Amino acid sequence: MPPVPRLPGRDAVPRVVVIGAGFGGLAVAQGLANSGTIITIVDRQNHHVFQPLLYQVATAGLSPADIAAPIRSIVKRQKETRVLLAEVTGVNTSQRHVLLSDGNTLEYDALVIATGARHSYFGRDEWAEHAPGIKTIDDATKVRRNILLAMERAETIRQESLPDRDEYLTFVVVGGGPTGVELAGAIAELTRHATDMDFRFITRRCLRIILVEAGERLLPTFPAKLGDAARKALEGLGVLIRLNGRVTDIGDYGVRIGDERIATTTVIWAAGVQASDAAKWLDADADRSGRVKVEPDLSVPGHPEIFVIGDTASLVDASGRPVPGVAPAAKQEGMHVARSLLARFTGRRAPLPFRYRNWGNLATIGRKRAVAEIGTLRISGLPAWLLWSTAHIYFLVGFRNRIAVGANWLWNYLTFETPR
């Protein structure tokens, strides 16, 4: 692979701009540490968020600080790395400039776009106001506030027959993938525990937690046996499962599934994602979800100096399988890009085309309940939950966060007290 050519007048020291400080972006920056490369990380937030656990912030299982870490603290030992709090509005590929919302630009010799994805409402963006998703700390705290306020308001209505009370105590999660399953289970445990311990005029039989999935089963990317195990675990928590349920409208009143109108004040969206605007910035080919179609080395066709990774990229890897938009894949892609850039800048042989190593699929359904697929191994129940917990603590960024989350989970497991 030839080295990346530099434009005339540029410094001899390579400049790498990384847009996005998620799993993939940080893996690139850390992989280039102490390489003599000037690295600039650009992000709209000054902290990295462990997104797989955002749902636990939304359901009062963890505090926001437990799953967030300042980006500058993560790379503080990398003297050649700087962090820029800014919003990217475009890329000038001919001049190799990243365009920022404040009018400034950043020069690059190599660019890595790891901007992730946002929620997709399948052309009904007006639903977002009534059915927020959970992609950021702000999203999670908003959902948590909505859930807890709904229960507080229901507590003030003493007569169980009043319709307003039912609306406050009905919680609808749209989407039966891992996020939706984990969220529905966590809401069920939170609300059941709260009614037992904290409230005086709400009982478990007043609650309705509804999980809506458009397909024929939950967890469609998992083996059918594990999807069935997840369904049974959720039903054991009192969650109502609506399979083959097509959401036709969401508004102030609640949600409509087919012809059925469900009155609720809390609808949470976990049904689909759309890639960031990277394809528009680059004028690149994209798939139906807006993800940039990349080469086997994760570079953009026609632009060997630009890489796209994580949820923003669409790739069928060397094994012939599509790379999923999950945290382990983004991290592996980031490490691969870092190795590729080091090879290019030093004139060494490039690594082989990217190949995703799938370490398995995990999803939890409350305390002591989870499903796991690790190679040919398929397990559920407590062993899967312990595996899920260990894996998530391992991938957390920062020793403090690992200790805090582990301690919180142990305390919650023993006492079920939640840091609200």
Annotate the PLM regions.
Residues 79-91, 188-296, 300-302, 349:
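A Rossmann-like FAD-binding core segment of flavoenzymes
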Residues 2-85, 89, 171, 178-222, ...:
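Beta1-alpha1 glycine-rich phosphate/pyrophosphate-binding loop at the start
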Residues 164-222, 229, 240-242, 324-343, ...:
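Rossmann-like dinucleotide-binding core of oxidoreductases
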Residues 24, 116-119, 184, 273-275:
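Short glycine-rich anion-binding loops that position phosphate/pyrophosphate groups of nucleotides
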Residues 2-4, 13, 333-420:
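C-terminal, flexible cofactor-proximal segment of oxidoreductases
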Residues 1-17, 81-172, 257, 268:
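FAD-binding core/adjacent interface of flavoenzyme oxidoreductases
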